[in-house]
């Protein structure tokens, strides 16, 4: 079982010719909604590949929240531990697209209602996990409580440190793997809590160049296949979900990274954060064709 503890957002996306000036109203050319949030994105990526996935998080007791839970169930994800809250709305991301650029306002909403006490009540679900995957779009004290129980139960953890925040003192020892991008990795290694011995906990994503990690003192690079990219939005989340899935299947770190890099590469060939996330059959076909 893969347990994902993280965010669930509804993306509200508008397209205009240019960004409005303060106080100005513009007529947009397109509006659409999509399911997002790093936590849910990564859960979907793992489930599409055939993983047994449960989601832990919060949504509002509102139409967005109800719609999201229905969608996740259709993706085969267990949502019994996603808590609807009545006093706060489902998390949203307001995205304006103009001339190839974007402007984004994230309203965490219900995502910040997942508290350490909730994790304590759900520790039985954590104990059944093969691996636990987290991000930093929820409260830090909640993430810390998940790490506490994971360490107590001897369960491997993956922390995707995005959006970036410095890793608090004491966390490094509890985390199995961190999956920063290049910029996040640079900041992590300059932080006061980083030690050289933690280098082998880092699996660094390099965008279209693939990924790199260190094992037994060696730097190991995993190159990415060349693809025609349509939308890179969900590549990082696909990588994390795939990594968790293949590690839970018992693959070595190197093999799991190789599969995750290929899954992320394939995901960018279709639009949408979740739209391009491949199934296991699609990924196998893609890799065999290489």
Feature-to-residue mapping (PLM):
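Glycine-rich phosphate/adenosyl-contacting loop at the front of the ribokinase-like
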Residues: 1-58, 63-67, 74, 229-230, ...
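Hydrophobic anchor at the start of a short beta-strand
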Residues: 2, 53, 79-80, 157, ...
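Conserved N-terminal subdomain of the carbohydrate kinase-like
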Residues: 22-26, 33, 48-130, 284-290
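Small-residue (primarily alanine) positions within well-ordered alpha-helices
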Residues: 43, 150, 185, 256, ...
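Gly/Ala-rich phosphate-binding loop of Rossmann-like dinucleotide-binding domains
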Residues: 47-48, 151, 248
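Conserved beta-alpha-beta core of the PfkB/ribokinase-like small-molecule kinase fold
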Residues: 131-193, 209-211
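Conserved phosphate-binding/catalytic region of the ribokinase-like
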Residues: 166, 194-290
